[in-house]
Amino acid sequence: MSSTHDSDLKIDDIEKRENAAVPADAHYDPKFVQKTLRMVDWRMLPLLGLLYAVALIDRTNLGIARTAGMQQDLRLDIGDRYSIASMIYFVPYIIFQIPSNLILRRMGSRLFLTICVVGWGAAQLGMGFVPNWGLLCVCRVLLGIFEAGFFPALVFIITTWYKRHEVQKRLAAFYLFSIVIGGFSSILAYGITFMDGSGGIAGWAWIFILEGIVTILLGILAWLFVPDFPDKSRFLNPEQRTMILARIEADRSDSVPDPMTWSKFFNAFFDPFTWSFAIMFLSSTMPAYAVGFFATIIIHGMGYTEAMAFILTAFPFVAAAISCFFFAWLADKTRKRAVWLAAQNVICIAGLLATGYASQPGVRYFGLFLTNMGASGCVPGVLAYHSNNITKQSKRAVSTAVIIAMGGVGGIFATTVYRQADYPKYIPGIWATIACQLTMLILLSINSFVYYTRNKQAREGKRVLEDTPGFLYTI
């Protein structure tokens, strides 16, 4: 067969993908497709969102407990103890990301996620009984170990169920659910502090104890209801499962997992795009963690009372949830990623400048709204952008783990540049966060240029992208 004919076939594949919005769906009743997708949505997204909300609360409630009296009891005001206790969680969180994702398929999502949730719930519970700063750090290390595989597993599982331009709304939906609940955790924690002295236990310790118990109970719920991968799912009938797999195969040709090899591992690990997305994810999580760990402290430093600081912490998260879903809907609707991520970077920068440099507390507080709105939407946005532009589940497992591990580096960055010495405005931390946003804008520009160029070559029959004929990058 001639090379010219090969090129014509490649161009035909591309045109079929571009012109047929739902090629695999055409064989099924649209009502059947929509009903099945709704079943998947309701079975998966609320529960995973709730579990991730608990994960966010358990990793970031240190700032709330500090304001509630832990600082005095454990002497976290000495040197950089608070920053170290916050940061040390991320070391095992980063180290165990890739190994966790590699065993996820072998172990199965239900067992894997249950072990993660119950394990970090026990670590959270233990934090309520620590007598000193050193043991607090030990519990934070255990928390990082058990949470390490959780978020990449969630992203991996969700992205195997949907077509590329359906993913960001779903990622945003479970993330939205988590940040709303996480935002109101400060008010819940404030209520728990009224248990101060009950059973001879301090109010801040009760925050860890009660939230740890809830987490362990949710681990049991995960065992009962968390869905597995599409090819292993049991809550769908055979026709529904076949339809889901056919949609994924038509969309990106990776409905069936391909075996992992060392060659595939290293190709995915050293792919420049893996690290481009990883640095973008770091740049997104850095301000999100900064708000999570320091919002209550910053608000308290504006002159608000302790009680008011707890209450006011919640509302920037509500705004972030609305913004997050709006941009996710816009991205899926337009089938564009980079431009909407860039818009959120600009919003985040504006918020950081307002919080850092405005003189009026109300304006500084409004800056936290903008910062959280810009940062939070980028977290699912970067993950969707990445998942749209790869095929093969082996590559998805490795690259997703690397990217989310770099999110842990963003957590380390946030907890170390917002230093106690810079309280209450944390100006060096503000500028470090702005630098992350500018870095992300540069990477978005580079990715867009390279993707555009390669798509043009693929349309001309000069290149096959991701070893998948007809595949085009999402820009």
Name what the model sees in each region.
Residues L111-L125, V339-A354:
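Structural signature of the two symmetry-related core transmembrane helices
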Residues I94-G134:
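Conserved MFS/SLC helix-loop-helix module at the cytosolic interface between two early adjacent transmembrane helices
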Residues G149-Y162, G377-K392:
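Intracellular juxtamembrane helix-capping segments at the cytosolic ends
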Residues G63-I64, S263-W329, V379, L383-A384, ...:
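Extracytoplasmic gate region of multi-pass secondary transporters
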Residues G63-I95:
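Extracellular/periplasmic helix-loop-helix junction of adjacent transmembrane segments
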Residues I95-G108, I322-K336:
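Helix-to-loop junctions at the C-terminal end of transmembrane segments
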Residues Q168-I201, F208-T215, T400-A414:
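Glycine-rich segments within core transmembrane alpha-helices of 12-TM secondary carriers
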Residues M1-V54, R59-T60, A68, W223-D258, ...:
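Intracellular terminal tails of multi-pass secondary transporters
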